[in-house]
Amino acid sequence: MAMNSKRKTPPGIALLRRVRGRNWSPKTFRYAILFITFIAYACYHASRKPSSIVKSVLHPDSSTKPPQEHNSDKIYPWPMGNVFVKREIGDIDEVLLHRKSKGWEPFNGKDGTSRLGEIDVAFLACYSIGMYVAGHLGDSLDLRLFLTWGMIGSGFFVGLFGMGYFWNIHAFWFFLVMQMAAGLFQATGWPSVVAVVGNWFGKRKRGLIMGIWNAHTSVGNICGSLIAAGVLEYGWGWSFIAPGFVMSLGGVLVYLFLAAYPEDVGFPDINSNSGKFIKRKRDVEEEEEEVEEDLGTDVEGDGEGSSGSGSGYENKRSVGLLQACMIPGVIPFALCLFFSKLVAYTFLYWLPFYLSQTTIGGEYVSVKTAGNLSTLFDVGGIVGGILCGYISDKFKARATTAAAFMYAAIPAMLVYHSYGGVSQTVNILLMMVAGLFVNGPYALITTAVSADLGTHKSLQGDSRALATVTAIIDGTGSAGAALGPLLTGFLSTLGWQAVFYMLVVGALCAGLLLTRLVIAEIREKLGYVDEEVPASEPLLTDRR
């Protein structure tokens, strides 16, 4: 399927170029691409957090003690006193919540946690299914427009979910449908942003660059938690409307300023080996060397610069799902991500609820505080993503690094569950360590590994497969992301220990699924050449 050859320069860039009178360098555009895609996907993740924040409001636990009045500033100095506090008499919604224990129909019954798990799985199942379609469309359509409409549509349906509060809706099907629609639109995000970054950056040190860039996941989670928790006292509906509005604004930013392809702003396709671009070769190469020094990345291919805007590039055909699945390494990493995201998304959707329903230092924390406290898991995730990317680049061993982190996540989670209630300080430290090991391999696989495989040498530079490969890997992972929260909804009724045992099994399976690739990487390090295991080749070497 040929790509549209009539793409236009983004209107915001076109306007600024007219005002400025000349174009920017490739180096400047690369920085802009990293920044805009970072903001875009942070918005995606921010809009996913509200459901985890409001769980304790929709389904209150009547067994917990009512809030007690106290002066929080005497416990924690500013700014901690305004963020990490116990249940306060000043939190009007929480006082009413514990006084009446009403919650919100249809989530306040005995099967409330199960229904909360069902709306999570509805979102993630549609997200997973939509990912496969979105990946192929992303390789076939204009990524800028595709991402724009995905963000606006997602923000719209996230906001509609929150309107159920103001419209006094208690029909389960309404919330289910809103989550399903939001999940389909959310599927446009990840394949698109990875493909855009892959269009502008080569493979060398891709793990470190994308490890840093992938902090948008945790930054989005943190911002989403803080926004949703911050407006919760005005009604839980605002916890959805505010992130949904921010999401739509992000879509406008993408439409105006995202140059999804170098060709759209007058530069060659770095993944092309065609040599059809004949102008500005020396200038482009000089800029590429500067970017390599600043960002640790090189530019592949021997394409040459063009001063055109986007209408003069060569057409690219997108690859099919089956062809993309045949790329060595795609299936093992996709299956690994299934279990990795099962673990990560269980924390994403249930950690605030878990924190509000368990004692920390002998005290219960408020719903708002639980949401704020859960952000520290993502702080650890930021460090984990960067560290995992750096190590995988240093040793040229993506699979070994990912597997090692997954195995390390097992004791980290068990220790957190066993000793996280000792005190708030211990809880924070153990939570960050768990976040480091859980989110590290998840970040590595969804970014650097996906981009590596999407530009695999078997494609010979003749196809666009970045979005499709990313969709296959992340779509499979999202099936696990749907399963984890669903199982948690049922297992939590048996006790949280059962949930953590499930997480341990998931992490173990994720590591074991990479065993074959780990062995191949170790054999290569020892000087053996195993031609029967080609899956690791694009992940270990810089050979073109």
Swiss-Prot record:
Chain intervals with Acidic residues compositional bias: 285-303
Disordered, as annotated region: 281-313
Keywords: Membrane, Sugar transport, Transmembrane, Transmembrane helix, Transport
Presence of keyword Ribosomal protein: no
GO CC annotations on file: membrane; plant-type vacuole
Chief localisation class: membrane
CDD domains (UniProt xref): MFS_SLC37A1_2
Family from the record: Belongs to the major facilitator superfamily. Organophosphate:Pi antiporter (OPA) (TC 2.A.1.4) family.
Name listed for the protein in its UniProt record: Putative glycerol-3-phosphate transporter 4
Organism: Arabidopsis thaliana (Mouse-ear cress)
